[in-house]
Amino acid sequence: MQYSFTEKKRIRKSFAKRPIVHQVPFLLATQLESFSTFLQADVPATQRKPEGLQAAFTSVFPIVSHNGFARLEFVSYALSSPAFNIKECQQRGLTYCSALRAKVRLVILDKESPNKPVVKEVKEQEVYMGEIPLMTPTGSFVINGTERVIVSQLHRSPGVFFEHDKGKTHSSGKLLFSARIIPYRGSWLDFEFDPKDILYFRVDRRRKMPVTILLKAIGLTPEQILANFFVFDNFTLMDEGAQLEFVPERLRGEVARFDITDRDGKVIVQKDKRINAKHIRDLEAAKTKFISVPEDYLLGRVLAKNVVDGDTGEVIASANDEVTESVLEKLREAGIKDIQTLYTNDLDQGPYISSTLRVDETTDKTAARIAIYRMMRPGEPPTEEAVEALFNRLFYSEEAYDLSKVGRMKFNRRVGRDEIVGPMTLQDDDILATIKILVELRNGKGEVDDIDHLGNRRVRCVGELAENQFRAGLVRVERAVKERLGQAESENLMPHDLINSKPISSAIREFFGSSQLSQFMDQTNPLSEITHKRRVSALGPGGLTRERAGFEVRDVHPTHYGRVCPIETPEGPNIGLINSLALYAHLNEYGFLETPYRKVVDSKVTDQIDYLSAIEEGRYMIAQANAAIDENGQLIDELVSSREAGETMMVTPDRIQYMDVAPSQIVSVAASLIPFLEHDDANRALMGSNMQRQAVPCLRPEKPVVGTGIERTCAVDSGTTVQAFRGGVVDYVDAGRIVIRVNDDEAVAGEVGVDIYNLIKYTRSNQNTNINQRPIVKMGDKVSRGDVLADGASTDLGELALGQNMLIAFMPWNGYNFEDSILISEKVVADDRYTSIHIEELNVVARDTKLGPEEITRDISNLAEVQLGRLDESGIVYIGAEVEAGDVLVGKVTPKGETQLTPEEKLLRAIFGEKASDVKDTSLRVPSGMSGTVIDVQVFTREGIQRDKRAQQIIDDELKRYRLDLNDQLRIVEGDAFQRLARMLVGKVANGGPKKLAKGTKIDQAYLEDLDHYHWFDIRLADDEAAAQLEAIKNSIEEKRHQFDLAFEEKRKKLTQGDELPPGVLKMVKVYLAVKRRLQPGDKMAGRHGNKGVVSKIVPIEDMPYMADGRPADVVLNPLGVPSRMNVGQVLEVHLGWAAKGLGWRIGEMLQRQAKIEELRTFLTKIYNESGRQEDLESFTDDEILELAKNLREGVPFATPVFDGATEEEMGKMLDLAFPDDIAEQLGMNPSKNQVRLYDGRTGEMFERRVTLGYMHYLKLHHLVDDKMHARSTGPYSLVTQQPLGGKAQFGGQRFGEMEVWALEAYGASYVLQEMLTVKSDDVTGRTKVYENLVKGDHVIDAGMPESFNVLVKEIRSLGIDIDLDRN
């Protein structure tokens, strides 16, 4: 088994019973693949597929002018490289994007040419088409300096759907069937029955009309309509009565209205008897062709065709007319014998289309189309052209209607056609086929569709959503271009004069900046990033709305299995509408979710893996992943638990066709991180998966001792760690950079064989948490491709580490853990276990105002020197300054308007000079409740504004750092090149060289060391090939030098050019504060099983319950939090964590007494290879075993994968191994070793019962009391009501609401009440009066009129009631 460099350091012992058959796919694949398909940036222009940008261009171009003599054709497009890299965009508040340029061709035809079009001139040109945001390698976008994610949307697939109203519309509870054809873009077409069984259609949910109008509009006559939907009965008229052509099936079940006889007159069915199968058989045996029927049998039947008098050509009766006695009379007069009527019955052949034809008043195709026109455009006069144009545009024009590839495939499958391709617009037979199926459904044949089935819902990813926006922009451009194309020849225009890129840019900008699906990335920790990018939302444009979504849409559907996680979804109004992709789910070419299965042939499980969509899955019998198989892959059990079409059943192995890939395939990433998930109640598991995303990264991340084995995948795929591109040897490491000398076999000849990784240091995330990378390799380490070189936020040795492992005791403790409160030991705080660093960004801008520019300066009047002590000469705070709430960070003054001066002030100003009072202090201060250390300052200056000293110094420092960086890189590159060169030169024969090297001398190491490195290139080698190699290396070094000089120049240009700032802004200063947050009462904490609580007290370490060996517990939780919540997983985690730590202590004890390596090997083999997945410890060298053991001292990490975890028996074995009987006895353990005797820290007495004690991975959540605590004395007031604002962000007050007023009324506290409702709230004059009185030392309240009373009076007046206050 192959272990990566980091895995060898600390192997996670897995309890999985099944081998890994299919690796978890790259977790961000959906986002990255979708967007690269959209851009096709790396595909040569000629080989681009018609999707994404290419599809948008080809669908809109060529654009032809109205007169047809000029057209604009699209040739290809190209994307330039972005001007700023990702980091620079984030700092400057820019969008990380690339300019899109399209090559277009303007073709002008000769108007004079009489017959065939002749090209007069062709102009080709590249035209700028706006900026396209680019995706970062981790699947997000940087828009205006902030990282955003485009969430995928789950919407109803285009195609045709049949459903009924479940009997809710009509009071009788009758099922009303309906069908809907949904295109990708264009008008929706609905068909629906009403309670009277008449079939209507409507376009775009407008007024409904009889469906036969639509059928006539597509060119069918009433006869053709009836022929399409009915079978006919043939009658031959006799002098008395008639002969009916006998079709046996049509008579079964009917009641005979007369005696039915055979040819000989023998009665087979008597009158009023029901005709059964025996009667039919008798009639068939008698070879009956016709049955004589009386006259009244014909009455009331409906004619299928027009009946025309052969002689006169007169229409006696039309199709769909009822047969009456007068009609029969006319028929006999005209001598017509044969007539056809519609065969209908009440059971499975309803007369629906015939009844609809009756209510339809239109006569022919034109009338039908006019009726549709009037419905679509009421009030407009229907001219012939307008009517035709509108009807064709509705469903037949490619510009206005697009079923899309998916829609056509779904449509054809649903109406039972074999081919899945076809035209993208609607065809006449599509409409007919849909109506036929709908009528069949009403007749009781077939099934309606389930719209929540994942075969009927598809996912739209970033690429597709962006393409739709881009196309919308292009369509706007097309309209403008069409107008101007007419003048193209006369005014000699070029393509760039025709195309205005504004509409495209604004469409793209609006989508990425403010669409409902473009969301501010949740960056609290790596898991929240991954989950956000794997989210699938049913909301958004073209999707559902919260209010309209019913219970069914939100519910878990059997087709979610392996595609969408049944657990992870938000609590609250969005429940079930926002979902997460399952671990192995993947999108097919049509956008439907697929999940992998192992193929089973003749009850033998093969290694072939097939991805099945929800529709395909319904056809197969699929076994669970935990079905028992022998070593040959044969299914063993007599009956295997399996699923078919959403139903679970037990079947024999020979019927199994597929098998699940892994037990964890049904859940999402977050849910698969919960150990013992199978023992938790679903509601708590939901909370657990959601709360892991809120875990704040701790100062020192600690891997969970009990994990699930997916932690490594999670950390690596999130992009928070640094991975090696190529294998090699670590050449240099410091806190900010790792240099790797690449292996010879991976280095490219003639290129530099060095990879340099610059780490991210103390950067602010979107949620103000700290992102910081730390190297985990040492100089000289050998690493291979994909190994983790540095840990990021919340990762420990390349594994996700969201919290800390705490020693937990389940017991009540003086009521401090009542109702989910958490009791924590002071030691946890002292050791900084849950301390986190939060980085706050504070901004100040100097604007150009009407009264003059604002100024950033240290020279601020009426501020004491003490307050300016931390500012430099430019008025900006030093880096490293520790600041508190209210301290000045950046000094700024704003010009004040001239006011009328009193003579005294005039005199003072004349004496003391002008400046005294015409500016006010608007400095940036630290907000209330915040304190911290300044870790970074950035100054942005507008082009043409003089930079201050600080800004210049920041630029100089940055350039100096960059130069050092480049010099280091060059040194490393040169060192590497010269090393390779020396290896090549030693032993070669020279033709001459520096220091009088004789011809034919062999070069040795000593000679080379004596020479300056750059003189090596002057050596003339005898071997031509070697000489060429020498020249190549020289060129490559010079090329690299040149590249570095260019890079430095570019960096200098970027830094020294002015910054793009919003209009009216001259300077902007950003100050970054690092705030240290220690754990304190009021912080929210949680485990991974939805067991959340709030810290109630931090107890001195000496008062905590402790074990017999003196070790105190870290956390005390209430045991009553477990049974009612049914999340027993937490108890099992505690037991297994206890075993993990116990094993770690034993290994630590062996290392301390310097036990022999063999003893360590034996003990490790006992841990790793007794049960569960086997680890290959044989391949480890003694040094590696020693390093492994050192890393295991803090606990042997366990993996208990979801639905395939550790059993009770395995946990028992581990506990026995961790706590031999002597230790168990000393600690007072119970026989199963999962409970311990504890002693009360305050009295030293032993608790009378044993206590469940062990280790649980506990998280601190991003709901910190520091962010919520807030107090106000005076502050901002609302404009209208003059009451204080609400909320911490607005520095608002506490609302004293209606109920609180009742309480004061009940107490009779009248003065307090008066104060609350007037001066403390919205009595403006009273407020100032109180202040005056306090200054005078006169403590009296003069309460006036509350402003809200005036508002009330005004509102009453606005209703037209004259109300006035009687002031007497």
Swiss-Prot record:
Keywords: DNA-directed RNA polymerase, Nucleotidyltransferase, Transcription, Transferase. One of its GO terms (molecular function) is DNA binding. Pfam families: RNA_pol_Rpb2_1, RNA_pol_Rpb2_2, RNA_pol_Rpb2_3, RNA_pol_Rpb2_45, RNA_pol_Rpb2_6, RNA_pol_Rpb2_7. SUPFAM superfamilies: beta and beta-prime subunits of DNA dependent RNA-polymerase (SSF64484). It comes from the Bacteria. It catalyses: RNA(n) + a ribonucleoside 5'-triphosphate = RNA(n+1) + diphosphate. GO terms for biological process: DNA-templated transcription. One of its GO terms (cellular component) is DNA-directed RNA polymerase complex. Its EC number is 2.7.7.6. DNA-dependent RNA polymerase catalyzes the transcription of DNA into RNA using the four ribonucleoside triphosphates as substrates. The RNAP catalytic core consists of 2 alpha, 1 beta, 1 beta' and 1 omega subunit. When a sigma factor is associated with the core the holoenzyme is formed, which can initiate transcription. Belongs to the RNA polymerase beta chain family. This is DNA-directed RNA polymerase subunit beta. It comes from Burkholderia cenocepacia (strain HI2424).
